[in-house]
Structure formats: C-alpha cells, structure tokens
UniProtKB/Swiss-Prot annotation:
It comes from Pseudarthrobacter chlorophenolicus (strain ATCC 700700 / DSM 12829 / CIP 107037 / JCM 12360 / KCTC 9906 / NCIMB 13794 / A6). The lineage of its organism: Bacteria, Bacillati, Actinomycetota, Actinomycetes, Micrococcales. This is Aspartyl/glutamyl-tRNA(Asn/Gln) amidotransferase subunit C. Gene3D superfamilies: Glu-tRNAGln amidotransferase C subunit, N-terminal domain (1.10.20.60). Heterotrimer of A, B and C subunits. Allows the formation of correctly charged Asn-tRNA(Asn) or Gln-tRNA(Gln) through the transamidation of misacylated Asp-tRNA(Asn) or Glu-tRNA(Gln) in organisms which lack either or both of asparaginyl-tRNA or glutaminyl-tRNA synthetases. The reaction takes place in the presence of glutamine and ATP through an activated phospho-Asp-tRNA(Asn) or phospho-Glu-tRNA(Gln). Keywords: ATP-binding, Ligase, Nucleotide-binding, Protein biosynthesis.
Length: 98
C-alpha cells in the first residue's frame, strides 16, 4: 500500500472542497499515514487460514419447542377493543389505500 503524502492530502482536500493550511496538510498526511500503516498491519495479521467473522464471539440461537398454551377466543381478545369488525380489531386508516 502506498504511503500517503502531503500532495495526496492536498488533492483529497481539493476534491472535498476543504481549505487546509500547509500546517494542516502536513499534520493530516502524518495522521493518515499512521492509519494506513495500522490497516496494513491488520491485513497482514489475518492469514488465509483465519475464517472471516462478523462477530468476535460465536453467537448461537436458543430454540425452544413452540407449544401452544392457553389462548383467548376471538370474543375474549376483542372484548376490550373500542371497535371490531368480522372478529378483527378495527383501527383508523393511516394510509389512503382501500
């Protein structure tokens, strides 16, 4: 990976329409060089034998059997509803679709 120099930073600043002083260009070039070196060292650390992961700790789902327990009848569920229609909760329309 090529090093980031002052000219690269000046070019990026022009593309982003950011005005930078000579001192800022020098400081940013140094900071970006450190970042590039850090990314390079991380890239070298992960070999081909290391599988790609999305999370550092293995995640497993805990499944349980889906057992139907005590349920309400439609009438019981709708007993406290302000409005219902055909055994369904009736709510005000929020979209202008029929």
């Amino acid at each position: 990976m090529a090093a980031i120099n002052r000219d690269d930073v000046a070019h990026l600043a022009r593309l982003a329409h950011i005005e930078m002083s000579a001192q800022e260009l020098d400081r940013m070039a140094g900071e970006l060089a450190v970042i590039v070196d850090s990314v390079k060292s991380v890239s070298e650390a992960a070999g081909d034998d290391v599988p790609a992961t999305s999370h550092p700790i293995p995640l497993t789902n805990v499944f349980r059997e889906d057992v139907v327990g005590h349920t309400f009848s439609a009438e019981q569920a709708l007993s406290g509803a302000p409005d219902s229609d055909d055994n369904r909760f009736k709510v005000p329309a929020i979209l202008d679709e029929a």
